[in-house]
Every structure is written in structure tokens, then in C-alpha cells.
């Protein structure tokens, strides 16, 4: 006979099948009643019920049973792993706990959930990943798409061999098998059951040089978290930070130019500052284009034993912000955040038992949100507007494509987003700077994670991502760029290949070609329904040779319109009634190619018109035959 817990689980599943349980409240009510009926001393977790549910029933019950749905509300499952205890190269900041002497990674107390998990697994990356994935699956989360976060102070200052070994072992754990090299592990992960769609490294601005950035990206990094703390050189020197704002500006620019997403850690309440000064420095983050991060984490200073700030506090030389002061300041800061920024965190994950002074409550984000709501001040950050977190589901049919343009670090950023009402369904970050290529630094579609290749997510796999990429390509071509590169997670490479991109590691790339100015020979009368001027689509196929040597016909986006005179469309003669010019969209693709022009005679500059026969092929041997698209008037 089944034990009481199994009977309870199967009764709940049957109640769901029959429709007697339809939401979380009714499920919890029935669960408590069954606990009493079966004389259980404690209430079994939802993970127990999930362990007995199978197939379609399990999938249908997930929204009711999943614990902490916010863990995957953004469309991916975050897996944080921590490096072994190691000190920062410059020493210790006045506020910083942890380090090798403390048996924890620098800047961590060792009591945070991720730190405890790391210690429990001997700081072994494979075991940490496997442990966290198992935890997520037990509480009902999908783990097809993993956002890998490498924590532990200053990862990029570690020995390069350790860095590569650590990352490889993370990929091995996701793949479920060992590889000889990191490259082999990455290649396996491109088609693995659990794919790494993004990878984050934590570091300092002064030890993330161009060489270190390139190494991190070769390992798979798509985002960096920089300990910025405050934009005040005197205060940074006072807390023995070891760098100033110049390093922050330099590092931010280097990261953006290479296509990384940039997250700043901001620490209100440092010695020597005040709420007013903190707010002034925070305002500078977005007023000055040398900064303007993509993401933020707020870490209001907490006094922890074993730090210099702790000694200052004991001596009466320093007092941290109290709860009311911190909540008011964070509300003021959140109200300033632009729509292209995502606030990742609002407080540290340090247990209250480890905090000697400062904020000890764990729901500061909710307290800040409540204060802003009471004051009628909305937060416009991405996280607060994500479709995956909204109780009122947006209407996909009413989604609008928006383009928020701003300058940052010597380049132009396009924050492209599909929004319905006040909700963000998905977005892309496109950067145009002095480099020859446009860079898609991020592509994101929100909602419950869809299984890879399936159409079972809230918003994923519904075409929003493809449309965002197409718009980014259009803007790139319009700006005169002939190439787009994407900062792609290892596990997303297959997706970009399906869009015509090729491997240009650490990027995925597509070569855009500007349309060719062409001419045709009029022949035959024009049908009466063809306008004298208008948009005509030519029947053009593309045979593509990519830099990686592969060939084949591909589907490509439409290029900027060019002027041609039409000889025939679809085999039927069609000419402008006045014999003048019309506009036509011409598909373009990547690499060296030839256009197979059907029923249209045209030639590129430098090609003899007699060599361009109707229905024939017009060769484009080099880029000299390409012209820049006309710029908007």
C-alpha cells in the first residue's frame, strides 16, 4: 500500500485532473485537508507532488506547483556557481568580507545560498551546476535554457588556466559528459539538452582589460558585472577600492565595443557619502554617456564583522543607512532608471544573522515598490515591465515595435522592444559605433521558458526574436554597415545559424550587402495596374558562400529599397506606364555571392549591360560593385 505522502500526492493530481483544483489557493486548501486526513505531521512540498505527476498532467500543473516562479519568469533558469576562496589582487576594500582566510570567495561571507552550495560541493564547478539544476527541477522549473553566473570576487584575475578549467567543467555538467577541451564542451552544448544561453562573470573595472575581455568572451561570456560602487574618486579612495572612475569609463567602453552587456554594482551608503550625494552620483550614471549601463544591482552597504567598516562602526566613526533612509533613497534611484535598464537586484543576499548593522529585512524590493506606488511614481526598468512577471498578460496582437535611441561610450545604442501597453514582450540591443560591424549585444524574449524547439512558452518561439533581429539588420544596413555580429551564448548559436548567421567566434555574424544600382531595358507594354512609382518586389534568389565555406540557398531579410526599372515580374512583362523608375526591395545575404535574377535584366556599375541577360545571372565579383544605401532624407 502506498505511504501517506504518495497517497496525498496522487489525490492532488486526481483532483487537478477532475477540475476540483484550478489554482494555488484551492490546491493548498486541499493539501492541508489531506494532511489532516492522512495524519501527516508536516505539509509535503510541492516538489513531492511533481515527482508523481507525469507527461501532460505534470506540464499543466507546473504553474500551480512551481516554487519561486520568478526564478524563470524572465525566460531562462539562472545557475550561479562560485569560484574557490581567493583574494582580490589589490587587497580588500574597507567594506568587503570574505577571502581566502575566511574560507570563502572574496566579497562573500560564505553564508549566502550560493556560497553555502559552493562549499557543500567543495567549490567544484561540475558539482555546483549539477546541484543547482537538480534543485530547480525539483521545484518545477525548466532547465533547458541556462544563464550561467560565475561569482566569486574577481574571476578574471585568476590564473587563465583555472578560469578555462572552471568554465569547461560548468559546460561538462550541463552536457552530462566530460570533454577534453573547452572548445569541445562548447560544441557539445550547442545541441545539448541543457544549453548555456548566457554567461556572466563578476570582476572589477581595473582588472578587465581588453585582453581579459577577449578571453572571457572566448570562454562564452555574454555579460559582465562590474563593481562600480559610486562615481566619486575621493570616496572610492577612502574605502580603499583600488580604482577610480577613469577605470570604470575605460572598461565600460571596451566592453560595449566588444559587444558585452554591462551590469554595474552600486553601493549606496559608503563612508563619506550621504543620501543626497548618492542620488547625485547615481543621476550621473545616465546623464554622462561614458557610463549608461544596461543593468544594475543595488547593494546598500551592510556592516559585516571582520571588515574595516565594522571597526569604524564600532568606534562610532560610521553609521549605515537605516531602513527608512535606504528605502526612500532606492525609490528615488529607481524613479530615475531609463527604460533600457534592467534592475537585477535591490539588496545583497547576506543572511540577517551576519549583518551587524544596516538593513536586515529581506523584502526591500517589495518595500521600495510599495513606497513608489503610494507616491504615484512608477519604475520604468525592464524587470518591472516584463511580460513574464505581469499579472495582466499583454496582447501579442497589439504588440508594437519601438526604438529607443541613446548615445553611450562613443556609439549609438538602439534599444528595440516589442511592447504591448506597458509590458515588454522582448527586446534587442543594437550598437553602432566606429567599428565596421553593427553589434547585437542582446536578444531577449520574456515568459516561462519554452522547451528548445517547442512552442510551449508564454512568448518564446513566437517570432518576436526573429523580428527583432530583422529590424536590427535593417538599421545596420541603413547606417551603412555591411556586417552584423551577435554576442551569442554558446547554446544559442544554432538559433542564429537558422537566421543565416555563421560562426565568427566568439560571435555569430552575417555579412550584409548593400543593394546594387541596376538598370533594365524596357520591353513591352505595362499592364494598367502597375503604378508609375511604387514598391515592387523582384523575383531574386540568393546563392550564398559564407566565410566558413558552406554554400546553399538561404532565406534573407530585405535590404534597403533601391531604384530599378522593371522588365518583368513573375514572367509577365511589367513596365512603368511612363517608362520611368520604380522602387524595389532586393534581398541581400552574407559572404561572396551571385544574384540569380529571374525575369529581370539589370547590371552593376562596371558590368557591361550586354553581359546581363534577362533571366540570367549577374555576377558580383567584389565589393566595388556595391553601393551604400541612400540615407533617409
State where each predicted segment sits.
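Conserved acetyl-CoA-binding loop-helix of GNAT-fold acetyltransferases
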Residues: 456-475
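Conserved GNAT acetyl-CoA-binding A-motif
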Residues: 475-488
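Conserved active-site alpha-helix within GNAT-family acetyltransferase domains
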Residues: 488-507
